[in-house]
Curated annotation (Swiss-Prot):
Annotated binding of heme b b566, by residue: 97, 196
Cofactor(s) for this UniProt protein: heme b
Name this polypeptide is given: Cytochrome b
Binding site for a ubiquinone: 201
Entries under PROSITE patterns matching the protein: CYTB_CTER (PS51003), CYTB_NTER (PS51002)
Location in the cell: Mitochondrion inner membrane
Record key words, sorted: Electron transport, Heme, Iron, Membrane, Metal-binding, Mitochondrion, Mitochondrion inner membrane, Respiratory chain, Transmembrane, Transmembrane helix, Transport, Ubiquinone
Cofactor remark: Binds 2 heme b groups non-covalently.
Membrane topology: Multi-pass membrane protein
Amino acid sequence: MTNLRKTHPLMKIINNSFIDLPTPSNISSWWNFGSLLGICLIVQILTGLFLAMHYTSDTMTAFSSVTHICRDVNYGWLIRYLHANGASMFFICLFLHVGRGLYYGSYMFLETWNIGVLLLFAVMATAFMGYVLPWGQMSFWGATVITNLLSAIPYIGSDLVEWIWGGFSVDKATLTRFFAFHFILPFIIAALAGVHLLFLHETGSNNPSGLCSDADKIPFHPYYTIKDILGILLLILILTSLVLFSPDLLGDPDNYTPANPLNTPPHIKPEWYFLFAYAILRSIPNKLGGVLALVLSILVLAVVPFLHTSKQRSMMFRPFSQCLFWILVADLLTLTWIGGQPVEHPFIIIGQLASILYFLLILVLMPITSLFENNLLKW
């Protein structure tokens, strides 16, 4: 009798994706983050669903409803903090996943990479709108500042902003639509993740060496299922430690003050995972220029495959490119730090230099270094 998992139409899809999938035998723990992102998404959708059962998207009651969830709902505090810190874990995994792709040349799978960039944009949009929902001070002013950036678009800018607001300022209409979008987007992200996997399974996984691994493939199950479970356990350990010991570590104290349009907080800043992009935005003294730099800071990832000048795929055997990669990581950490600092000397100049270096590394220095390494090997 033929095996059901190989013949049943639904089981066959699962089998070919997670059980009998031919996988390179040498992929390291850096390849765990795809499954971790899947787990993060599931956790976010489930906790978000339970939060939505008690949340009200009205300016008068939004803040109170979140307080009610934390105080009166059974384990509401746990659900709320799992959701808030789950977002942080999501972004940590995302950044590591993208970093892995850059280091090992996974971006050479064009379709997979481009869907990934689209996913990054979608997750960032979802997180931004979710941050607005508790209707604290930072929620309100963050929404005001970021949506206002669209007014920099020539000709249609101011009309566009009022259209998004649903009025002349961030108000009830804005909150209601942000809640609607925040609810629907994770399901769109899940669908996109399915397409991401579909394209990945067309080519098969990359591996640390960047070489073709067709001659040495092993089944995904049990080897990588057990490896993924280890990663998932570590993720759960870190997330629960964060939630149970210091749930507000990554949050902003200002968000425990109800939104007040008449009182601006001294330092408006987004969640930590947006600080690098926020620093790039602030480093340009022109509004439109800043908005373009902000968008390009993520969109530049889509250009990376076309700037690959090396004869080798991975950075595993390219020491000079490795140095530049780690400089890029340090630069992003610097930008993250600057994004949380006030706009004053010396932070302004540090932010501007770090922003220039960010684009310079990706667009100029890395491709030139790759060409230099080709000559070094006399290829």
